Amino acid sequence: WSKRSLDILDRLGVGQRLVDKGVIWNVGKVFRGDDKTPVYEFDMLPVKDQKRPGFINLQQYYAEEYLFDAVRALPNVDIRAGHEVTGLIQHKDQVEIEVVCNGVSYKICADWLIACDGNKSSIRGLMNLDFDGRVFEDNFLIADISMKDERPSERWFWFDPPFNPGQSVLLHKQPDDMWRIDFQVGWNIDREAATRPENVEPRIRAMLGDEIKFKKEWYSIYTFQC
């Protein structure tokens, strides 16, 4: 979460909760090959003594929990869990929304309907709207692991390291002794096979050492889009 994001979240009353839970970092380092000396360093907060850090690392489910708590505290918000929007009709001065819950359908009329339901938004689908942008022909393996480690809270990025030759790797520290490793794995891969523990864990040990003790939290593949 960037400083700008935290400034916005402050306006919603949840910025401090994110900072209190998150791992603060300002410094990033870039390495090449097996060289232990970074080829480049940067500081996301060159002007010190600001209210918020350059970045914090925090799992998304914590941010969603804090935002949900803030919304639930508002007197003019009605939260309806388990309700699915299945249809909508746009009128000149309002929108008519069809909702289904437990097999029962009902309708709501509102001035505005805001699509905040992610990149596979059913709202956007009902309106035949797509996310314009570019899909990069590459895949990345996310390995979220828990382990005890004294590495500094910095963003470390490798080009062509010996533990992932010809590709890149990113390492981030997160709360609760969680570490996120992003391995670039290429385009034409078997996505299911790439996330099997017997294929992921040799990568982790090649990077962190054979003796490292860690616990799997989450392995997945993502494709970068913007």
Predicted segments — roles?
Residues 71-86:
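A conserved beta-strand/loop element that lines the FAD pocket in flavoprotein oxidoreductases
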Residues 35, 101-105, 164-166:
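Glycine-centered tight beta-turn/hairpin loop motif at sheet-sheet or coil-to-beta transitions
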Residues 87-108, 113:
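Conserved beta-strand-loop-beta-strand element in the redox core of flavoprotein oxidoreductases
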Residues 41, 107-109, 142:
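Well-ordered beta-strand positions in beta-sheet-rich domains
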